[in-house]
Design a protein with these regions (language model features):
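Core SAM-dependent methyltransferase catalytic element
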Residues: 129-131, 135-164
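Charge-rich, low-complexity linker and terminal segments
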Residues: 104-107, 125-128, 147-148
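Conserved SAM-binding loop
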Residues: 1-101, 120-127, 157-163
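Conserved aromatic-histidine-acidic binding/catalytic patches
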Residues: 58, 110, 114, 149
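Catalytic cores of nucleotide-sugar-dependent glycosyltransferases that transfer UDP/GDP/TDP-activated
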Residues: 86, 112-115, 140-142
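Short alpha-helix
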Residues: 112-136
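Conserved catalytic/acceptor-binding region of the Class I
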Residues: 100-116
C-alpha cells in the first residue's frame, strides 16, 4: 500500500493493520516514511497493489506527470483511489497559471494552495493516462442519519482507478 500525503485517521488505522506493507509518501509530512516529489517517485515500476491519494492532485502544478507516476508504480490489476475535489457544475477543469496569489486562488480554486478546480473531465483525464475508472457514489450506501453523523459529502464520487 502506498499512501500519498497521509491523513492522520487513515494513517493510524492502516499502520495498525498493515504495518509491514504500508508506505507513506509526501514532500513534507512528518507522517511520511519516504519524502519526495509525486512527479518523480523513487519506486520501481509496478510496485504497489493499492494507492491511496486523497486531495493531492489539485495542489500539483503538473498533475498529468503525477498521474503518470501513480500509474507507473501501480501493479497491473492494482487499485488506486485518486480523490480530488470536483465542481460537478463544471464540465471542464479550470486552471490558469497566472493565478498565483493566495487571494486569487481562494476566489478561483476554493483554497489558497490549489492550482486548479477540477471539473467532470477529471475521470476522462485519468482514463487518458491508462486507468480504467469506476465512479463510486459511496454516499448512496448510507442512510440519511449516518450521512449527517459522519459528515459524508452526499454527491461526492470516488474514482476507483484500476491498471489493466
Amino acid at each position: 500500500i502506498l499512501h500519498v500525503a497521509p491523513e492522520q485517521a487513515f494513517f493510524k488505522f492502516l499502520k495498525s493493520v498493515n504495518n509491514k506493507n504500508y508506505i507513506t509518501f509526501d514532500l513534507n509530512s512528518p507522517l511520511a516514511d519516504i519524502k519526495g516529489d509525486i512527479c518523480a517517485m523513487p519506486f520501481e515500476d509496478n510496485f504497489f497493489d493499492f494507492i491511496l491519494c486523497n486531495h493531492v492532485l489539485e495542489h500539483i502544478v503538473d498533475d498529468t506527470k503525477a498521474m503518470k507516476e501513480l500509474y507507473r508504480v501501480l501493479k497491473r490489476k492494482g487499485i488506486a483511489i485518486l480523490q480530488v475535489p470536483i465542481n460537478v457544475g463544471r464540465d471542464k477543469t479550470f486552471e490558469d497559471n497566472n493565478i498565483t496569489t493566495k487571494k486569487e486562488r481562494i476566489e478561483k480554486f476554493g483554497q489558497y494552495d490549489h492550482v486548479r478546480e477540477y471539473g467532470l473531465d477529471y475521470y476522462t483525464k485519468l482514463e487518458s493516462i491508462g486507468f480504467s475508472v469506476e465512479k463510486n457514489n459511496y454516499a448512496s450506501k448510507f442512510i440519511e442519519n449516518d450521512i449527517n453523523k459522519f459528515g459524508i459529502v452526499r454527491d461526492e464520487i470516488i474514482p476507483i482507478c484500476k491498471k489493466n
